[in-house]
Each structure stands twice: as structure tokens, then as C-alpha cells.
């Protein structure tokens, strides 16, 4: 019945508002007009919140009934899910472990290529996710191993996504190596 669809639609929208609103408001209040020294940890957490919010917006767009009919079985769903994880949870985790690794070492100076590694992480992650979002917006199904001729845009997007995912994973490995190196110095 249409009434239940409307109730479900409103519940989907309203359920996301408290969590997203409180989180985003808290982060901006913590940053706004403060003389915070921007460290790698702070940057990773701040961008991680942005990734989490963008993934949430993708979920809300997909939760709209008129969009869900079109988007749900497309690459849009893995796009917003991977946005939560790749640009949210992973950045939070790297930020925490980086912070943890400098708590027990005297050298708090960042590694030589930290800015480059951060740029690789962000560019690789954004490019990887953009390939998913573009595929979803183009109605490319998410469950094909080979794409039919009418969905031929899926194959080039998959290649582009794989290239950016490789850049992203290399950056994660560099961060992991540097964090591990710091932690092993403590032992």
C-alpha cells in the first residue's frame, strides 16, 4: 500500500538525520574558529567524517523509493557502501593507528613522503569510488561478470576503478609500513 511506502520513506530519511546532524555539527564546532594544529591524524579524521557523510548521502538517495527502483541493483549500492568504508572507516583507522604510533616514540615528525601518500590515498579512493558512482548513475548492474553490449560502459569504468583502487591500496600499504616501523621501534 502507498501509505506504508510513504511511512517507510519518511522513516528512512528521519533515521539518518540525528546521527548525521549531530556528528557533522560536532565536527564543525570542534574545528570552527579553533587554532587547531592540523596533524595527519586530524586531517584523516576530518576527511573520514566527510567520506562517511558522503556515503550516507548516497544511501539516502538510494533509499528514496523512486530512485531505489532505478539504482538499487546498480553499482550505486557498492559506491555508497565503499564510500563509508574506504573514505570513512579506513581513514579513521589509519588516523588512529598513526596517532597511536607517535604516542610512544620521540620522533613525531611525519615521514618524508606523508603528503604524497595522503594525496595518493585520497585521489586513489576518490577515483575508485567515482567509477562506482558513475556506473550506478549509468544504470550498470552490480552483478555481471561480463557486461552485455548495451552496458559496455561498465568495462572501462571497471578498469579505471581498478587503477585508482591500486593507487589507494599502495597508499594504505605505505601508511601501514610507516606505522609498523614506528611501533617496532618501541619494542
Language-model segment annotations:
Residues 36, 106-107:
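Short, exposed beta-strand "edge-strand" segments with a Pro/Gly-rich flavor and a Y/T-containing core
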Residues 70-75, 149-153:
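Juxtamembrane membrane-water interface segments that cap and precede transmembrane helices
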Residues 29-38, 64-65, 69, 74:
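Alpha-helical transmembrane segments in multi-pass integral membrane proteins
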Residues 9-30, 43-65, 79-105, 112-147, ...:
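Hydrophobic cores of alpha-helical transmembrane segments in multi-pass integral membrane proteins
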Residues 2-13, 39, 71-79:
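Non-cytosolic membrane-interface motifs at loop->transmembrane helix junctions
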Amino acid at each position: 500500500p502507498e501509505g506504508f511506502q510513504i511511512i517507510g520513506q519518511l522513516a528512512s530519511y528521519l533515521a539518518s538525520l540525528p546521527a548525521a546532524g549531530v556528528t557533522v555539527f560536532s565536527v564543525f564546532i570542534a574545528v570552527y574558529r579553533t587554532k587547531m594544529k592540523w596533524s595527519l591524524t586530524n586531517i584523516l579524521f576530518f576527511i573520514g567524517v566527510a567520506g562517511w557523510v558522503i556515503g550516507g548521502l548516497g544511501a539516502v538517495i538510494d533509499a528514496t523509493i523512486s530512485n531505489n527502483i532505478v539504482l538499487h541493483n546498480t553499482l550505486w549500492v557498492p559506491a555508497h557502501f565503499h564510500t563509508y568504508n574506504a573514505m570513512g572507516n579506513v581513514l579513521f583507522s589509519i588516523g588512529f593507528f598513526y596517532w597511536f604510533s607517535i604516542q610512544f616514540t620521540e620522533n613525531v615528525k611525519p615521514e618524508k613522503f606523508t603528503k604524497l601518500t595522503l594525496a595518493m590515498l585520497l585521489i586513489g579512493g576518490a577515483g575508485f569510488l567515482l567509477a562506482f558512482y558513475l556506473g550506478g548513475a549509468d544504470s550498470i548492474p552490480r552483478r555481471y561478470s561480463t557486461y552485455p553490449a548495451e552496458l559496455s560502459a561498465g568495462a572501462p569504468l571497471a578498469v579505471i576503478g581498478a587503477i585508482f583502487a591500486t593507487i589507494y591500496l599502495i597508499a594504505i600499504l605505505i601508511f601501514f609500513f610507516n606505522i609498523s616501523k614506528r611501533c617496532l621501534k618501541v619494542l
